[in-house]
Each structure stands twice: as structure tokens, then as C-alpha cells.
């Protein structure tokens, strides 16, 4: 994403400027879909589309051709249903929770049934309504998180009447180690999935997440289910990231100062200035999704220059050592880059000792948000939308 934001541009009272490139999002979707042209390609938009705004993201993906969307909770599904065309199918990964049957049926929400109990609930509701209801059925192929156990699958295979009133859209599972192409679990889960699918003849299979798409044709099946790769995150630990960056984060400077040698910086005085040091305090901290684990190890960037974090990350602010820049380069209102061309999601996640998913979904609501629409110039987008 070639986003040119003036380094003297104030953030309009916000802690910083979060820019979301919807054109790159669309391109990532089309790239992933193009890897398996015989398959459909869904989009995982749970957690407010990984923190980027499910309403805007989902509409962009729908316009790109996506017709299947996955969220985690029923409330996410209901909110999305109000914004998307009736042509879109919305799946709830956490399944059918007690009391949600009426809402799912009335709003055409498709639960992912993860247990015999959930299957019984949905079947009973179908009988009560006197109509067939759609669902996906998830199989636990080795992650031990959600889905029918081998014992439950055996019972279901022997008692197909348990599915009375249910039309199965997909039988599905989730890969635990797809981002590690050589992990033995991938082939093991594939074998279990293939065997499990025989209990549902003629039913389409949904198996591949972002990493799974890159494991090859054996993993593609009827429906792909990417998440992090849509948003520019690396789908695999093997090789360079093939996805376009979707997010850029620039944070405003709120004060600069020069401190003498021996000064203790930040909470606990965990950084000591060994020489006279120029510092800049920026207006974002761990409340804004920049983890405390970045203390004394992470950095911001300015025009290709790394600016190390000096001391501990605070709730609302971070102190940077800006001694590498000419004096006067940064002033109040200047913007430094936290995520962008010089520092990817994976870079900042590595410094924080976490994963790109956690960084992305943790970005707070205090940033000024701008969306670059497909075909829109960055200069126009930088002042076009403020999503809070």
C-alpha cells in the first residue's frame, strides 16, 4: 500500500491514523480465489473483520464476488445480516447456543453445528417450524477445539435420522498448523477429514483456512475459508508474504524533549539514557493495541529511520528515542509509522512476542480511520472516512 501521509499532519485529535486499503483487500480476496478456481471462496469476518470494520469490509468483499461469510458469534451474524444482501450466507462458527434457534432461523443465519446436542437443537427447531433448516457440520480432525468427536461422528453415521429437518451446506473442519507447511498435523488432519466426509456423501467440504490454501490442491475442496490473508497477514511461514498490505498505522507525536545522560525514562525507569538523548512521546499505548511487551524492544519508523521504544509502553503513550533524526525533524503533530512499508504486521508482532492476528484485532477504536476505496487515490482517502 503506497500511502503518502504528511509527516506533519496532525491526527485531528485522535491518537493516530489507521488507514485501511479496501482495494488491497479486494485484490487479496481475488488472489486467493484464483488459487482454486474450481472452489468457492468465503471470507472470515469475525471480530469486526479482524478489527477493520465488518460492515465496510464485508460489503467490499461481497462486491468482489464473495457470497459466504463466517463470524464467531450470533450477534456478529445478526449485525452483518442487516448490512448484506440476502444472497450472502452467514455462518456462525461457535455454533448453535441455547436460545439462539429462533434468531438464526428468522434471519437466515447458518449455524456451524459442533456437537450432537447442537444437531438435536437445530433438528427440533426445524420440526417445530415444519421446514428444513440449513447448517454446516464441523468435525474435530485433530485440533481438539470445536467439532464432532470421532465417537459422535460414529453415532451420527449410524443414526442419520438425527439430521432430520437439516440441510447440510458444508461439512467442515479447521487446520491447526497450516501456516507451517511441513507440519505432520496437516496431512494427518487431511486424512481424518477425508474419512469423515464419507459419512456425508455428496455434501461439499470446507477445510482450508488461509494457510491451508497454500498447501495445495488436496486441501482446497468446495469452499475455501481465508481470514488473516485477506487482511494482508502472512498465510504461511514459508517464503515471503504474497498478500498485499491492507493496514497502515501512523501515530501522532505529542511532545519532544532532550534529556541528559543518566535520565531514567518511563515507568519503573527501565531505560537509562547513556548520553544526552532526544525523545518523542507518541499518543498511543497498550490501550490502543500496541502491547506492553514492546517495551524497550519495539520501534516506530520515520522516513526509513528506526526509532527505538525507550522504556515501558504506557496505557496511552510510548516514548521513542529519536536521536537518529536531525534535530527538529519531529514536532508536535508529526506522524510516525507503527505499521506500514517499514514495519509489517509480522515485524511488530515478532517484536511483541505475539502473532499478527493479535496485533490486528487489538488495534483500538481511538484511531482516526480512513478507507481507501478500490480505485481511489490515497490522498483522497486520507480525509474521506472517519470510522469509529
UniProtKB/Swiss-Prot annotation:
Coiled-coil segments: none
Cofactor names: pyridoxal 5'-phosphate
EC number assigned by the record: 5.1.1.1
Active site annotation, chain numbering: 46, 267
Keywords: Isomerase, Pyridoxal phosphate
Gene3D superfamilies: Alanine racemase, Lyase, Ornithine Decarboxylase, Chain A, domain 1
A GO BP annotation: D-alanine biosynthetic process
A GO CC term attached to the entry: cytosol
Biological role stated in the UniProt entry: Isomerizes L-alanine to D-alanine which is then oxidized to pyruvate by DadA.
Name under which the protein is recorded: Alanine racemase, catabolic
Gene source species: Agrobacterium fabrum (strain C58 / ATCC 33970)
Lineage: Bacteria, Pseudomonadati, Pseudomonadota, Alphaproteobacteria, Hyphomicrobiales
